[in-house]
Amino acid sequence: CLAFLNGMDVAGRMLERGEIDYALIVDGETANMVYQKTLARMKSPDLTEEQFRNELASLTLGCGAAAMVLSRVELCPDAPRYRGGVTRSATEWNTLCRGNLDRMVTDTRMLLIEGMKLAAKTFAAARLAMGWAVEELDEFVVHQVSRVHTDAMIKAFGIDPKKVMTIFAEHGNIGPASVPIVLSKLKEMGRLKKGQRIALLGIGSGLNCSMAEVVW
């Protein structure tokens, strides 16, 4: 869920140390096999109600791909700038969502509850590390699992819903690709202006939470 943000962070550190001049970050997500295998299991007459519920989240997954080029600031001085970010973990909850190529088993209720607790800790760290104040951030690009999860984050942090572009209704949960795809769509719509501060937010299985900033 956070692989693209993690990739940006690793690349950013390498660029700052002068180890590389450019970095290409690429993510591709496909859910076709998961759909087929999940539906086959859900048709089994021996499936219990609990097993059925645990399989449901797999059907919210979507397909998508994105790529981003990062460079040292002196090579592209007028480009948007990645300011870095913070990450926090709560690995005691590592069993809430487990998956592989053909199956994902999820406790959606506990994932939401514990994920939001971790997000609150991460947001507090972002305030200290990057001087975040909700009203001073122009857009919030959120890794989107569902309307319930997105609305919970908006409510918890007091975010203006108009600053959160949602794509899950059309694309589903496209995992790590959701953050760069939302960012790209905002650019296409002309919503990103030079100097604007854009927050990138994501909660992933593990549990892990990352928050970062781009200055356009």
Give each language-model segment a name:
Residues M14, D21, K37:
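An acidic, phosphate/nucleotide-engaging active-site surface
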Residues R17-A23, E55-L56, G64-A65, C76-D78, ...:
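Short coil/turn connectors at secondary-structure junctions
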Residues A23-E29, L70, L200-G204:
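Short beta-strand segments
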Residues G28-E50, G84-D102, V145-K155, P176-I181:
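Active-site-adjacent elements of ketosynthase-type condensing enzymes
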